[in-house]
Amino acid sequence: MNAIQKYFKDRQSLIDQYAKGDMTKREYLQRNYEAVIYGDIGPFRNMDTLEKALFNYQYYNALAKEMKTVSTTRDMDYELKRDYMEKSNYYYSKKDKATLTALRMLDYKGVEAYFIKIRSKFLKGKLFEIVIEEEGIILHSTSTLILKCLREEGVFQEESRKSVIDDYVNRRY
């Protein structure tokens, strides 16, 4: 088992613990963040395999969520909050690059995407889910570029659906 496979195995264990109620969403996010940051692998410059692209997705998603969480700290200086939000947005853009790389590697085959029903007013009509059936992979994005590509490839369903992981995406952290 290589380092990426070990990460995804450990991540699945965290998901299972979260699903059983053994940890909160915040605890799950923190443990996943620690796994990508302190693991023996970092982001890949050359995403030449689906595995590497999906790891980069997880890596940058974890960093983006952590920066966003830090930005909500009470009594933090406005400039510092803004810096953390900018970092969060930067990491989300890197995550979207990894998403596009993965979709292109798959040539959009076995991919289905749609907007998800979400409680957040800010994300309603923006957040969509990408399901890669054969791999059992669920990705999320708000990227208009990715949305455009999914539509052009004919894999985006113009409807809002309940997310495959509805409890997770609609739970605050």
Label every PLM stretch briefly.
Residues 39-58:
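Short, charge/polar-rich alpha-helical segments
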Residues 11-14, 57-71, 98-99:
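Non-transmembrane amphipathic alpha-helical segments
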Residues 23, 28, 129-132, 137-139:
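Short linear proline/tyrosine/threonine-rich motifs used for host-factor recruitment
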Residues 3-30:
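Short terminal alpha-helical segments
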Residues 168-173:
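Short acidic DE-rich linear segments
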Residues 17-27, 69-82:
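Charged, low-complexity interaction regions
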Residues 26-32, 77-96:
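Short, charged, amphipathic alpha-helical segments
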